[in-house]
């Protein structure tokens, strides 16, 4: 039986984009076998972490991210809202926990949080954490001292995605540079908060761009503990509303490559899952995804219903992760 040699990592311990491309180009069965083997070395392959995501401040963002309906620059029809009151956030968090979620993420459409907003979010973090939920927030760019304030409140994870490769990034966002994102991630890491960082597939990027994104993530020291892989959800009124859909097998390959290059990370099957069949979702889990967003919506896009997710887990013989 012929075996295909795995691309060798450079002795410096860094993934080159060419190495990641070589992983993408493995025959599909071989790639999934390798990804599942790596997955089983570090995780129970029958467990899935269930995360819920709440938009605590929707719309009105000054950034121009081409995929996002929350940008004030796009005519998506989404009305801007103020920051949710604490009691409403806690009601949503309790409902998420009662539905089976172990992790609660809060997202705000800001370029960067103002001091009084950060104080309010810190209080949300404290109260949600007191419910026994793992906490994550995504608030935009952080300035000096802000990550430490969130750490003091007990924040577990901060999400700040790279979105795509450095080479393709300017085609998607112009109001925030790639280095701006890396600077925020450095502040998060230096404050002792776990990093949640991934990207979006299907924005018109090439396979090499996808490989470059994975290399950027895998070469972080250390690589993110949480890696959300999103499938673009085209939203009317945004610049990427007419983006051509990426082949589902290319998306599954991305999950597998993320698992191989970041063995201990939680690889999160994120936006776009609503359009996938049960079989396609099962292949993503086989490829190494071990977390899903659980609930009816993801910020401003749809998500499979809780009952559908429970039914799928039952069919696959999988179960929620034990906290």
From Swiss-Prot:
Residues the entry annotates as binding [4Fe-4S] cluster: 61, 65, 68
EC number of the protein: 2.8.1.6
Superkingdom: Bacteria
Cofactor requirement: [4Fe-4S] cluster; [2Fe-2S] cluster
Gene Ontology molecular functions: 2 iron, 2 sulfur cluster binding; 4 iron, 4 sulfur cluster binding; biotin synthase activity; iron ion binding
Pfam families named among the record's database cross-references: BATS, Radical_SAM
Pathway linked to the protein: Cofactor biosynthesis; biotin biosynthesis; biotin from 7,8-diaminononanoate: step 2/2
Keyword vocabulary terms for this entry: 2Fe-2S, 4Fe-4S, Biotin biosynthesis, Iron, Iron-sulfur, Metal-binding, S-adenosyl-L-methionine, Transferase
InterPro entries for the chain: Aldolase_TIM, BATS_dom, Biotin_synth/BioAB, Biotin_synthase, Elp3/MiaA/NifB-like_rSAM, rSAM
GO terms classed as biological process: biotin biosynthetic process
Cofactor note: Binds 1 [4Fe-4S] cluster. The cluster is coordinated with 3 cysteines and an exchangeable S-adenosyl-L-methionine. Binds 1 [2Fe-2S] cluster. The cluster is coordinated with 3 cysteines and 1 arginine.
Residues the record lists as binding [2Fe-2S] cluster: 105, 136, 196, 268
Reaction equation(s) it catalyzes: (4R,5S)-dethiobiotin + (sulfur carrier)-SH + 2 reduced [2Fe-2S]-[ferredoxin] + 2 S-adenosyl-L-methionine = (sulfur carrier)-H + biotin + 2 5'-deoxyadenosine + 2 L-methionine + 2 oxidized [2Fe-2S]-[ferredoxin]
Domain annotation Radical SAM core: ranges: 46-264
PANTHER family membership: BIOTIN SYNTHASE (PTHR22976), BIOTIN SYNTHASE, MITOCHONDRIAL (PTHR22976:SF2)
Family under the similarity heading: Belongs to the radical SAM superfamily. Biotin synthase family.
Subunit and interaction comment: Homodimer.
NCBIfam families reported for this sequence: bioB (TIGR00433)
Function description: Catalyzes the conversion of dethiobiotin (DTB) to biotin by the insertion of a sulfur atom into dethiobiotin via a radical-based mechanism.
Official protein name in the record: Biotin synthase
Encoding gene per record: bioB
